[in-house]
């Protein structure tokens, strides 16, 4: 049995010591395929267009500078239009060019002459950067979906700027305890119900009500803990008291916001009100360590610390480097997600799991948000559990834009 907190094979990543171009050249030299860097049997000895870099007209003939998939930039060649059988890449090339010119001209009309002349170096540079960004984001998206253990798919989108994947973020599906912290994920009791919805089940043993209705929607007020059936229970996976442990069921998109809030998360499907959406996971650290890290994060203007203060204030979840999709969920003073403490296999009340449920119906395309303070809801009284992220020393300006915006995140 693996030690508590041990990572699954392949969970650790290290930076490569050579460039992608060098790796591709080495693979071709040794006749090796490597899908993750674009070297496949299909293009090992053949040429496939990866993206278009530049454009020019010579003697009334259109030429495009082609980046060949799996080949270094040094092998790029100018090809006449009639040789290219990649209509989607051609369309993407012109879309990127148009977007760049639109940004430069700040919405002014682009003339026919401007749209057909040879590209200026700045335009070509932007198109190449955008193409490389698109490839990097696709690889990151693929990596996220390989690592996730839940049903819902993860998509990545950036139509705002040239920002690529975060360089120091590692996707995890559950808490990662820091050295010296042990998570005992083994329940001390379990139910023997034949129907957990009607019988006295795990919640009753803990002295609370069953959290869900027949439609798998949460029915208890914020501040009330959720006790789900666990690995010792005799009920099966279809038990109505196994919701959070099934993971995210919705397809979500990590997207670049246009209001200066960096990355955000939106749902790609409709989410019914009071439904479980995702867990907030990260590295579990002591409150003392959280205080130290918090001072560093304040200087960077980032907020990823979340106090586990259901019963005590001993531990904090830090999602800055290790986390899941919730790492990218932005704050709002008028959020559509609400935090609940959850206990499943680990019944240590100092270490609840943090689940986010929808407060209302959320339509496809809407950004998901939660209140980093969780004190503005009328559902939480002054003596209820404080679910707020770890306390900060510097005030961070809020950009949520809500009518009820408090002006600061803390």
Swiss-Prot record:
It is found in: Nucleus; Chromosome, Centromere. Zn(2+) 1 binds at residues 191, 193, 196, 201-202. GO terms for cellular component: chromosome, centromeric region; nucleus. CDD domains: CD_SUV39H1_like, SET_SUV39H2. It catalyses: L-lysyl(9)-[histone H3] + 3 S-adenosyl-L-methionine = N(6),N(6),N(6)-trimethyl-L-lysyl(9)-[histone H3] + 3 S-adenosyl-L-homocysteine + 3 H(+). The keyword Nucleus applies. Zn(2+) 4 binds at residues 333, 398, 400, 405. Although the SET domain contains the active site of enzymatic activity, both pre-SET and post-SET domains are required for methyltransferase activity. The SET domain also participates in stable binding to heterochromatin. In the pre-SET domain, Cys residues bind 3 zinc ions that are arranged in a triangular cluster; some of these Cys residues contribute to the binding of two zinc ions within the cluster. Residues 394-410 form the Post-SET domain. Zn(2+) 3 binds at residues 196, 229, 235, 239. S-adenosyl-L-methionine binds at residues 261-263, 304, 330-331. Zn(2+) 2 binds at residues 191, 202, 229, 233. This is Histone-lysine N-methyltransferase SUV39H2. The gene is SUV39H2. It comes from Bos taurus (Bovine). Residues 250-373 form the SET domain.
């Amino acid at each position: 049995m693996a030690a508590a907190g041990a990572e699954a094979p392949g969970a650790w990543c290290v930076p490569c010591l050579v460039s992608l171009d060098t790796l591709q050249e080495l693979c071709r030299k040794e006749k090796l395929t490597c899908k993750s860097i674009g070297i496949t049997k299909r293009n090992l000895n053949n040429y496939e267009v990866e993206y278009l870099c530049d454009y020019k007209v010579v003697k009334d003939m259109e030429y495009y500078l082609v980046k060949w998939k799996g080949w270094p930039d040094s092998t790029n060649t100018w090809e006449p239009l009639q040789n290219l059988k990649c209509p989607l890449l051609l369309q993407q090339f012109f879309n990127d060019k148009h977007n760049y010119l639109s940004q430069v001209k700040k919405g002014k009309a682009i003339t026919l002459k401007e749209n057909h002349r040879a590209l200026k170096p700045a335009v070509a540079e932007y198109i190449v950067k955008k193409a490389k960004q698109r490839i990097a984001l696709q690889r990151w998206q693929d990596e996220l979906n390989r690592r996730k253990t839940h049903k819902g798919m993860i998509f990545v989108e950036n139509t705002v700027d040239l920002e690529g994947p975060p360089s120091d973020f590692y996707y995890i599906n559950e808490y990662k305890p820091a050295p010296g912290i042990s998570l005992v994920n083994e329940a001390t009791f379990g139910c023997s119900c034949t129907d957990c919805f009607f019988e006295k089940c795990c919640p009753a043993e803990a002295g609370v009500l069953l959290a869900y209705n027949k439609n798998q929607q949460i029915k208890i007020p914020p501040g009330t803990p959720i006790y789900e059936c666990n690995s010792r229970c005799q009920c099966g996976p279809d038990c109505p008291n196994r919701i959070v442990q099934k993971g995210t069921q919705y397809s979500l998109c990590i997207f670049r916001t246009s209001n200066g809030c960096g990355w955000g998360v939106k749902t790609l499907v409709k989410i019914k009100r009071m439904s479980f959406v995702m867990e907030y996971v990260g590295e579990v650290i002591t409150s003392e360590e959280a205080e130290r890290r918090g001072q560093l994060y304040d200087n960077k203007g980032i907020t990823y610390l979340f106090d586990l203060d259901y019963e005590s204030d001993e531990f904090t979840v830090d999602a800055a480097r290790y986390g899941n999709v919730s790492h990218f969920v932005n704050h709002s003073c008028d959020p559509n997600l609400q935090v609940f403490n959850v206990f499943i296999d680990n019944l240590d009340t100092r270490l609840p799991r943090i689940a986010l449920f929808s407060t209302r119906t959320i339509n496809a395309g809407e950004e998901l948000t939660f209140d980093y303070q969780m004190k503005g809801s009328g559902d939480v009284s002054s003596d209820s559990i404080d679910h707020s992220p770890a306390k900060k020393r510097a005030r961070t300006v809020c950009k949520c834009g809500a009518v009820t915006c408090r002006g600061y995140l803390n």
